[in-house]
Amino acid sequence: MTPLNDALYRYVMNTRKLHTDDTPVKVLAPGLKKTKTGRIWTYVRDDRNAGSSSPPAVWFAYSPNRQGKHPEQHLRPFRGILQADAFTGYDRLFSAEREGGALTEVACCAHARRKIHDVYISSKSAMAEEALKRISELYAIEDEIRGLPESERLAVRQQRSKALLTSLHEWMVEKNGTLSKKSRLGEAFSYVLNQWDALCYYRDDGLAEADNNTAERALRAVCLGKKNSYDLCQILSPKRPYAAPGASLYRGL
């Protein structure tokens, strides 16, 4: 399967935008009676939301831990937009010192929204509810333009989303100043504000997405099948200390 895997790896990396995420997986190592925790990483090429007719595809890789060197290795040939969560292991990918140049960081609005939503569910905070309402207005626009060409998506975002994002930022900065930084809502708002530029990148690029749900969906099959992953991960990487194109899970969408 190696030639097929290598071909898919090249195809997935040969694009302008990728979605990435990871999940823990228990690994039954040869000769040991107990399991260790490894990681499954996903890299998704899928531009259908921006009107692309290119086939989507997913490349998965296994690593024995969550160190940032693994995505660095996986993404060595990639140049472009990387949509991901705020995991610090990705930081060097966005550095100008990265070999081949820095990748463009795009954060996940859904991840940021989830933190605020969790606060609202537990506290029914009016401030959290208002934040969710404002974010839902942005998502309503994304629903309208899903599948349109990049240029049309960008035009709509500039005409409608830009002002909403500016208003949200001003409102959140003001309200965050009234909150304890140790409160759950204060932590959620600070999380959003600390990533603001990366969260808003999609406003200025019709190819980018507002969130990283594409990668999260790709990992669902792994999460549902973790019991079957013990032996699979053992087979994938019995002798390799790091994941590589020849030591991966892969599939198309």
Identify what each model region corresponds to.
Residues 1-253:
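Catalytic center-proximal scaffold of phosphoryl-transfer enzymes
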